[in-house]
A protein has these predicted regions:
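Helix-breaking motifs and short loop linkers at transmembrane-helix boundaries and internal kinks
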Residues: 47, 79, 100-106, 244, ...
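Cytoplasmic helix-loop-helix junction between adjacent transmembrane helices
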Residues: 110-149
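Primarily marks hydrophobic transmembrane alpha-helices of the MFS/SLC 12-helix fold
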Residues: 81-84, 107, 280-281
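Conserved MFS/SLC helix-loop-helix module at the cytosolic interface between two early adjacent transmembrane helices
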Residues: 66-102
Length: 421
C-alpha cells in the first residue's frame, strides 16, 4: 500500500489533482442524469414503455445507495489512487456495455453497476479531496468534486441529450465512454498516490462511520435534500401549470436554476470552511423562506425566476458543508462515511421525488412547493440541534498509519460546534 505524500502541504500537485477529481465527477454526473433526456428514445428502441424505461433511473439510484457503501466496505484496505482509477475503469466498461447493447435487461445491469461505482468514486474522491489540502481549505476541495456534478447538469446533460436526439442514444453512452477514458488517464497521471486515510480494518471504519452522531447528520441531509427534490422533481410541471410559461421559457428557467446551483456549490465550499455546521443551519432557514416566497410569487414569472436562482444557490451550496460535516463526525471512519454521505444525498433525491409524486397525484402540482417548505421548517430544529450537539471525535492514530499519515480528512475538516451552555 502506498503512503500519503501530503501534497496539499506543498501545493505542487493539489490543483491538477482536484481538477481531475472534478472531471471524474462531471463525467459521472452526466451519466447519471442524461438518461432522463434520452429515456423516450431508449423506450422506443428496446420496445418497452416509458414507465418501464424509467427503471433505468431507479437502477442507477439503487446502485448508488446500496452498491456504493458495499463496494467501499469491501475495498476499504485499498489505496485511494487505486480505487479511483479502478472505479473509472469499471464505469467505462459498464457504459461501453450500455452503448453496445439494445437489450433492456442488459441496460438495467449496466446502470446498476454504474451507480455502484458512482457511489464509490464520489465517496473516495470527496474524502481524498479533503485530505489533499491544508485545514481551512477542505470545504472548497470537497466543493470541487460536487461542483463537477453540478456543472454536468448545465453542460454535460444538455449536450448528451442533444447527441442522443441527433445521432442516437447509443452515441450518448459512447460519448460518456470517451470522457471517462480521459478522466481515467488524468487520474493515473495527476492524482497523488495516497494510502488509506483512516483505520485499515472494516470493523473500525464501520464503528465510526455508523456512529449515532453520523447517522443523525445523515438524517438531517435526507430531510434537506428530500424536501427540495419533492418540489424540484416536478418543477417543469409547476412552471407550466402555476407560473403559466411553456416550451423554451421553461428550459430557460431550469437553466437559471442549474447555473445558480453550480455557482452555489463552489461558493458553498468557502462557507463550509468557515463553519460547516453553522452553514447548514443558515441554509436550512434560507430554504424555508425561499420556498415560502416561491409559494406566494409562483404566478409571477419574473419573481419566480429570482426565487429559482436563489434556491439553486442555497440548495446546492449546502452540499459541501453536509459532506464535510459527515466526514468530520465520522473521524477515523471518514472514508466509509463519505460514501454514506453520497448515498444519503441520492436517497433524499429519490425519496423526495416519490413523496412529491404522491402530492401531485393527491393535491395537484401546486402542492409540491408547500410540501417542500413544510419539510424545511420541520428540518430546522433537527439541523440546529445537530450543529450544536454533534461533535467530531478526537483524532485517533491507528497502527496502519505512520506519523506522516495520521492526518485525516476528518480530524482537520470541520470545527467542533460550540459546547452547549
Amino acid at each position: 500500500m502506498t503512503t500519503s505524500t501530503q501534497p496539499g502541504r506543498s501545493g505542487t500537485r493539489t490543483g491538477p489533482a482536484l481538477a481531475t477529481l472534478a472531471l471524474g465527477a462531471f463525467v459521472i454526473g452526466t451519466a447519471e442524469l442524461v438518461i432522463v433526456g434520452i429515456l423516450n428514445l431508449i423506450a422506443k428502441d428496446t420496445d418497452v414503455s416509458v414507465g418501464t424505461a424509467g427503471l433505468l433511473v431507479t437502477a442507477y439510484a439503487l446502485g448508488i445507495c446500496v452498491g456504493g457503501p458495499l463496494l467501499t466496505a469491501v475495498t476499504i484496505k485499498l489505496g485511494r489512487h487505486l480505487l479511483l482509477w479502478s472505479a473509472l475503469a469499471v464505469f467505462l466498461a459498464a457504459n461501453a456495455l450500455a452503448a453496445a447493447t439494445s437489450a433492456f435487461g442488459v441496460l438495467v445491469l449496466a446502470r446498476v453497476v454504474s451507480g455502484a461505482v458512482h457511489g464509490l468514486f464520489i465517496g473516495v474522491a470527496s474524502a481524498l479531496a479533503a485530505h489533499l489540502v491544508p485545514p481551512g481549505q477542505q470545504g472548497r476541495a470537497v466543493a470541487m468534486v460536487f461542483g463537477g456534478i453540478a456543472v454536468s447538469t448545465v453542460i454535460g446533460v444538455p449536450l448528451g441529450t442533444l447527441v442522443g436526439q441527433q445521432i442516437g442514444w447509443q452515441a450518448t453512452f459512447a460519448g460518456i465512454v470517451a470522457l471517462t477514458a480521459v478522466a481515467l488517464v488524468a487520474t493515473l497521471v495527476l492524482v497523488p498516490r495516497v494510502g488509506i486515510t483512516g483505520p485499515a480494518g472494516l470493523g473500525s471504519q464501520a464503528r465510526h462511520a455508523f456512529a449515532p452522531r453520523v447517522l443523525a447528520q445523515l438524517g438531517v441531509g435526507l430531510l434537506l435534500l428530500g424536501g427540495q427534490f419533492a418540489a424540484f422533481t416536478y418543477l417543469a410541471s409547476y412552471l407550466e401549470d402555476v407560473t403559466g410559461i411553456s416550451g423554451g421559457v421553461v428550459s430557460a428557467f431550469l437553466l437559471v436554476y442549474g447555473v445558480a446551483s453550480a455557482v452555489g456549490v463552489f461558493g458553498g465550499g468557502r462557507f463550509a470552511d468557515r463553519g460547516a455546521a453553522r452553514t447548514l443551519v443558515v441554509a436550512n432557514l434560507a430554504l424555508a423562506l425561499i420556498l415560502t416566497a416561491l409559494h406566494f410569487v409562483g404566478k409571477n414569472p419574473a419573481l419566480t425566476a429570482v426565487a429559482l436562482a436563489v434556491w439553486g444557490l442555497v440548495g446546492f451550496g449546502l452540499v459541501p458543508s453536509f459532506q464535510l460535516r459527515v466526514i468530520s463526525l465520522a473521524g477515523p471512519g471518514g472514508d466509509l462515511a463519505a460514501t454514506l454521505g453520497a448515498s444519503a444525498v441520492n436517497a433524499g433525491i429519490a425519496g423526495g421525488a416519490a413523496v412529491g409524486g404522491w402530492a401531485v397525484e393527491s393535491h395537484g402540482v401546486d402542492s409540491v412547493v408547500v410540501l417542500a417548505l413544510t419539510v424545511m421548517f420541520v428540518a430546522l430544529p433537527a439541523t440546529w440541534a445537530a450543529s450544536r450537539w454533534l461533535r467530531p471525535p478526537a483524532a485517533e492514530p491507528t497502527p496502519s498509519e505512520t506519523p506522516d499519515t495520521t492526518r485525516t480528512a476528518a480530524t482537520d475538516a470541520v470545527e467542533a460546534p460550540p459546547r452547549p451552555a
